[in-house]
C-alpha cells in the first residue's frame, strides 16, 4: 500500500494545535481594510477553530500532521 500524501493546499491553510484541534485564519483580512475599524481588523487577526463538520474532511487530507 503506498504512502498517504498530504494535501499541500490544505496544509498551508490550516494548523493542528497541540491538543489536536484544527485551527484556521479568519477571512476578509487581505484587502479593502480601510473601511474596517481597527477593532474589526484586530478581531480578524486571531485564529479560530474549524467546525467539527469540516474537521473530519481536513484531517483526512492531513494524515501526518
Curated annotation (Swiss-Prot):
GO CC terms: chloroplast; large ribosomal subunit
Region: Disordered, residue numbers: 18-50
Pfam families, per the entry: Ribosomal_L35p
GO terms (BP aspect): translation
Composition-biased stretches (Basic residues): 22-44
UniProt KW keywords: Chloroplast, Plastid, Ribonucleoprotein, Ribosomal protein
Locations listed in the record: Plastid, Chloroplast
InterPro entries (alphabetical): Ribosomal_bL35, Ribosomal_bL35-like, Ribosomal_bL35_CS, Ribosomal_bL35_sf
Keyword Thylakoid in annotation: no
SUPFAM superfamilies, A to Z: L35p-like
Molecular function via GO: structural constituent of ribosome
Family: Belongs to the bacterial ribosomal protein bL35 family.
PANTHER family per the UniProt record, alphabetical: 54S RIBOSOMAL PROTEIN BL35M, LARGE RIBOSOMAL SUBUNIT PROTEIN BL35M
Official protein name in the record: Large ribosomal subunit protein bL35c
Species in which this protein is naturally found: Porphyra purpurea (Red seaweed)
